[in-house]
């Protein structure tokens, strides 16, 4: 076996490992975000988060109900961030996790593990 063949085998192994980690993290995200109905394959989630346009014209009672739902989503995300960090730490101790509501309609998750960075983005199915 020459050096080039060895390098190709190494590159393939590295790629396979990276893809395996990416899928493992994706599955962990799906598991943790199940309460807000995340679909990791379609990059969507289903939670009634509202924006200012939607909020206008709502009664105080309706507004409060929407606000409670949005807070519930934020609570799930905060809890998910901690749990995801613990799960990913099992793969490699050098990891970081950042879960955020990028806007009223998008959840963004960034995971860095073993010097590999993965970004996952989920769009709200309710958004226009």
Where are these regions (language model features)?
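Charge-rich, solvent-exposed alpha-helical interaction surfaces
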Residues: 5-12, 16, 24, 28, ...
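Short intrinsically disordered terminal tails
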Residues: 1-4, 8, 53-61, 117, ...
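Acidic, low-complexity, intrinsically disordered interaction modules
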Residues: 39-119
């Amino acid at each position: 076996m020459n050096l080039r063949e060895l390098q190709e085998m190494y590159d393939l192994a590295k790629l396979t490992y990276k893809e395996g980690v990416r899928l493992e993290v994706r599955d962990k995200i799906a598991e943790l975000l199940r309460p807000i109905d995340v679909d990791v394959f379609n990059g969507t989630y289903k939670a009634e988060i509202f924006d200012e346009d939607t909020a206008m014209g709502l009664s105080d009672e309706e507004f409060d109900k929407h606000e409670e739902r949005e807070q519930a989503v934020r609570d799930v995300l905060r809890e998910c961030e901690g749990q995801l960090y613990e799960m990913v730490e099992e793969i490699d101790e050098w990891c970081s996790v950042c879960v955020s509501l990028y806007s009223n309609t998008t959840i963004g998750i960034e995971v860095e593990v073993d010097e590999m960075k993965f970004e996952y983005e989920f769009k709200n199915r309710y958004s226009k």
